[in-house]
Amino acid sequence: MTLNGWIQIALYGAIVLALVKPLGSYMTRVFTGERTFLSPVLGPIERGLYRVSGIDDRQEQHWLAYTGAVILFHVLGFAVLYAILRLQAVLPLNPADQTAVAPDLAFNTSTSFITNTNWQSYGGETTLSYLSQMLGLTHQNFLSAATGIAVAVALIRGFARASSGTIGSFWVDVTRATLYVLLPICVPYTLFLVWQGIPQTLGAYADATTLEGAKQTIALGPVASQVAIKMLGTNGGGFFNANAAHPFENPTALSNLVQMVSIFAIGAALTNVFGRMVGDERQGWAILGAMGILFLAGVLVTYWAEAHGSSVLNSFGLTGGNMEGKETRFGIAASALFAVITTAASCGAVNAMHDSFTALGGLIPLLNMQLGEIIIGGVGAGLYGMLIFVIVAIFVAGLMVGRTPEYLGKKIEAKEVKMAMLGILCLPLMMLGFTALATVVPAGLAGPANAGPHGFTEILYAYTSAAANNGSAFGGLTANTLFYNSTLAIGMLVGRFFVKIPVLAIAGSLAAKKTVPASAGTFPTHGGLFVGLLVGVILIIGGLTFFPSLALGPVVEHLAGAAGQTFATGG
């Protein structure tokens, strides 16, 4: 642990905090229909899109209609992406002559990108054409991110409105999220990445001769445009198999910093949007404060674990920390910070190999996902995931004082609590259920490259990542099989829709309620006491649910390593 490392972490936190208010103010104006500085340019385009699509932007939807639109949007997106992948060999922009993607892999990949997971059981440069990368994956990166933002805004309206039968229009929300938020940032962001050295070309792969005379093919493509939205939209899927560790995706320390900032930018700013739309910015800062506490704790543990290395490494005199699987241009601090950021959000991009982290260093990214990625989280998904925990925390506070729980003037009743618990419990069902299955069937046991607790963690990490819609992986798992492609895809679908649908049900229920004036007995939800309660509820639920699985994996691995015990490679 070095002063330079701490400065990097502090600088990152300061930049993200500095963006919260201006970006939050801008997005509030976008989603409340107010005029912005981009309205003169984008307004005519927006209205033109509505006319072509037959959408009345003044017609709002009941929560059931909003939910139906969300599901339909995903179904259509899946069908288009699946068709592109299966027909890849006969479609244009395929200079490397990539063949059609296999049915099970196409199913997994299509599910992955429409759900904002971006799990990849393949290497992009050896599997996909430029058309598949652009029209298929990059396109869905925009739409899946916009969908998450739209659902979060719908839930905010549920808290902000009173006696209302509608929560907005999905078609308007997803259009504005794409047109006014994602695209205006991604265009200059892409140009910045090109300046940093990331390729953006439709030219064929380049053939090169090394200094030793060997022939080498250098993969190229429209990389910068995909990297920009994969980071900003917390999608995470890499153009190349090495993801953000590849020098063509993340070549410099500056590009690394900007990419890390962009992962958190929208998610952090949405807490400010929440505060502004409910009429009390302190509410947003309280939620961001809870997120910040959990994030900082994760960074401290991961940085400490990686900087101190493992007892096995230290026994060989390697006392410089754990550099295995890390890029020297980033070092331990930036790699540990990136790992916590990408799993606190639902991004999943990596600039180091998580499978090569120490046992405790790998535990934190795993735990971040198991908590539901509510520490900033994915664009939109992080906020509505955290608000689910807020509802549970308010319910617990109400039980302790014997009062009907209230939040922002809305009574939290049985329906909201049931929907919140459904959204929370569907994740461990997928994460732990499929992990248990994979450890007892031959097709599952054939996947991990390592024996013992680390092999178990590789399986647990995969299903946790899929259900949490993260997409990062312990790379030692061979996942491109019928068993893993199918079960991981099911986990992604349940993790996406069995959270979104309860969230929209909560939004509709709250929007229809009247606002109750605050009284002397109302529990304040903008101070330190509430932040502490919220953090406690998150850790208790996460700890009770996932501690047994963590004990079987990274905890046992750490204790065994401290005792000098290692496990042979091989599942």
Swiss-Prot record:
GO molecular function: P-type potassium transmembrane transporter activity; potassium ion binding
GO cellular component assignments: plasma membrane
Superkingdom field: Bacteria
Keywords: Cell inner membrane, Cell membrane, Ion transport, Membrane, Potassium, Potassium transport, Transmembrane, Transmembrane helix, Transport
One Pfam family, short name: KdpA
Major location (coarse): membrane
Quaternary state and interactors: The system is composed of three essential subunits: KdpA, KdpB and KdpC.
The protein's name: Potassium-transporting ATPase potassium-binding subunit
Gene from which the chain derives: kdpA
